[in-house]
Amino acid sequence: MKALKFTLSGNSAFFKDNVINTVYLTYGNIHRVALLGMLGAILGYGGYSKQNDMLKKKNKKIPDYPEFYEKLKDIKISIVSNGKNGYFNKKLQTFNNSVGYASKEEGGNLIVKQFWLENPSWDIYILLDCDEAKKIADYIQNRKAIYLPYLGSNDHLANIMDVEIIDIEEKMSSEDETIEILSMIKAS
């Protein structure tokens, strides 16, 4: 079997975690839906805002999932963190959002606090067993993209490096054999 392998990295990343609303936390690693969204952007598929805007104009019911998810949900991926023990340092960023509608406070200034991942890096593997996966491989190998890939939001540009097609083999275990699966952290 063949798989696409590449390293996904950036200076910073922000994958919003909605646990609290006084400060915006980030997930510690890229999650599947964020990765699918980034791959969908590379291929030019619609996301949440594009889907909602188009349907609101037509007074149509908003479907459960955006275009990128409908098209890419079945691809088989593995995300392997290159961080020490799978973790990346986080840094608190504070900035002002001074557009008038950002805050109902006097002056319309909203102070935003976000935790960003510093220098994140992952090895991404995509099994090339369907047309969508092969299309992703074509775009990434040939450095094509409809929309720029980001690591969570447009403040965090994504670097895609070390792109290659690799051979992988399926492992089957017997009753007396254990197979260790390390899909998030590299084996030491």
Task: Label every PLM stretch briefly.
Residues L8, L35-M38, W116, G152:
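Long, contiguous hydrophobic alpha-helical segments, chiefly transmembrane helices and signal peptides
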Residues K5-F6, L55-N59, Y101-E106:
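A short linear-motif detector with a strong N-terminal bias
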Residues Y65, Y69-D74, V80-S188:
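Internal, well-folded beta-alpha domain core
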Residues M1-T22, V33:
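N-terminal, Lys/Arg- and Ser/Thr-rich interaction peptides
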Residues D17-V99:
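Glycine/small-residue-rich interface belts in oligomeric ring/scaffold proteins
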